Amino acid sequence: MTAAHKQKAKLLAWLKLILWGDSISQRIFHFYIYCILLGAVLLFLPFALKTDYQKVISYEVDLQGHTISKQTASYGFLDALFLAVSAFSDTGLSTTVVSETYSVFGQTVLAILLQLGGIGFVVIAFLVWRLFKLHKKGKYSFYEKLMLQSERGGSKLGTTSEMIVVSVLFLFMVELLYGFLYTILFYFIPAFESASVFQSSGKVSNQLKALIVDSTKRLPVVHNLNLAFQYGFFHSLSAVNNAGIDLLGANSFAPYRTNWGIVIQWLAISQIIFGGIGYPVLFDAYEAIKKRRLYGKYYKHQFSLFTKLAVLTNLIVTAWCFLMLLMVEFIVITSLTNTIAHLNVEKAYLVEGLKNKSNQELQSLIFGPIPAASRVMQLWFGVISSRSAGFSVFPWSAESDIIKGIMVIAMFIGGSPSSTAGGIRTTTLAVIFLTLKAKFRGQKEVKVFKRSIDGQTVINAFLVAVFGLVSVVLIAILLPLSMQQPLSFVDSLFETTSAFGTVGLSSGATKIMALEPTRNLFNYLTLGLLMIMGQVGVSSSVLTFVKKHPQGNSFSYPREDVKVG
């Protein structure tokens, strides 16, 4: 082979590596990038927007539902790219109010992106391939199974394709059923636009400025069958895929925070759990039900270690976060409930129509007819949503730093592997705690449920946690540097953890970024990278840049201990 041919072959190899990748992790990563770029281009088209390249960042209405302020800015490709990343990674962070900025076409593009990202691009490609090109006797190549296992599979390669089919069909059925339920509820439930409690120019804390009550203006979806159908299925897709993107306005699910709106909250909670628990858990449950019907009531199914760890850790983390929030909210003197119960001079800055209300009446308007019970439900919905969904029934900028700190922990952990959720994942946390437990007890192996966990899995768990923590904290430190408005470290950490956990809850930092996209280019890109990392998983993100055949693996040096700690 001549030098010219060698040079050409080397160039083609480099192009293949850059455009296609060398390993399975790299190829999946490339697929994701191409989907995001295509989505960004579609979202940047003029007919994807309601107005001529203008975005609505936020707006406020008074108690009568009249718009008293609307924050707008020029819409650029950075906004389209950021939302495409957010939708495909099923995060929900946005520099715009989606319902006010995007047309039906734009909203349809978002729905497709969040479906592709949630179910899995490779998984959907596999299902389409299976539908239109039948394999002989249902056999699939080893490489195809590896691709599926890498994106959404479990530990058993042999059952991967069956697990994918069962889990995705179940989630599609849930999306369809819940879509009709949402349609009925959105049509009939009287929901109203959210109005501010305090004057925006009032000398009160940002926490109090974020408080909202219902105005007298009904949402356009009420008694509008076309919109109810559109909203119903969009939010069904968004909830199952743990996306957190909504069409309800500037305050997410806040219009449904009380009364009959609680039914919608419970529907969303169940969908969030279905989408975030993991494909292996869904398949394990399917196998248990199928075999129990086949062999009778005396059959005892042996659930996998993954299922046991994922379900148990999910329950423990959710219960811990919820109890901590309850303690803070009803015991700590600086909690939001106590703050509203003891308002004094701040009452002078209430909006017209609320100035003569007592503190008790204000609590009822803000939280609901039974304030304590409604507040408990709001916190419960917040805990479930913080695991990866991103819907909110209350502005998180109104919460105290202590509550935000608890939510940061929940968002950082995230949901289960092989699901629509992000974060370090529940099984990672379980392996870390089990390793610490074994170390303190002097045990040589990490054991749980009569099984031993492989040493490499332990190393991977600590790698994922440390890499994720360093990334989130480092970007949280850098995030406020280019902001044109002050941003506390807690709010910055809340935003970066929300991106990494693919949650979508916001403390307001994303809206500040939206005012000057060019100035905040670094923040756009770093939050986008965190969202992709959270979606793909830290392990896969790191593996994307790992050499396939690294030098130095063919030999080893003599070992020597190093004192640590």
Curated annotation (Swiss-Prot):
It is a multi-pass membrane protein. It is found in: Cell membrane. Belongs to the TrkH potassium transport family. One of its GO terms (cellular component) is plasma membrane. GO terms for biological process: metal ion transport. PANTHER family: KTR SYSTEM POTASSIUM UPTAKE PROTEIN B, TRK SYSTEM POTASSIUM UPTAKE PROTEIN TRKG-RELATED. The keyword Transmembrane helix applies. Keywords: Cell membrane, Ion transport, Membrane, Transmembrane, Transmembrane helix, Transport. The chain crosses the membrane at residues 28-48, 73-93, 109-129, 169-189, 262-282, 315-335, 364-384, 393-413, 461-481, 526-546. This is Uncharacterized cation transporter MG322 homolog. The lineage of its organism: Bacteria, Bacillati, Mycoplasmatota, Mycoplasmoidales, Mycoplasmoidaceae. It comes from Mycoplasma pneumoniae (strain ATCC 29342 / M129 / Subtype 1). The keyword Transmembrane applies. GO terms for molecular function: monoatomic cation transmembrane transporter activity.
